[in-house]
Amino acid sequence: MFEGERIAERLAAEQPQVHADLARIGVTGIYKGDGVVLRARRPILRHDETGRLAQVSFNNYDRDTVRLADDDMRALYAGIRAFDSMANEPEMQWRYTLRPGDMLVFDNWRVLHGRGAFRGKRKMAGAYIN
């Protein structure tokens, strides 16, 4: 897991143009499953009306086809590379092996999550609260 806001802050400080591009360029995410197709288009870094970071949407697996002008496409790919590079720095990550009975609660608009290799069986259940 890693805190998306922390990466956004680093990008703003170290690569301000990349941060601005990731806040400007809309990316479509898509989910298909269980008889539904959900699509949403938003920038990777979404800010509220006050300029405060409201949501980080970075998911390489749910990204739909991207159709952009050449300059925006290059800027988006540069931003994705920069974001992904920071996200994969060990000091940016928090790793924990869940045990039976453990519960993990986090803000899905701020914390990004994934999984690493493991041995054995696992069963997970997820829920969303609005």
Write out the residue ranges for each language-model feature.
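Active-site environment of non-heme Fe oxygenases that use a 2-His-1-carboxylate facial triad
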Residues: 1-130
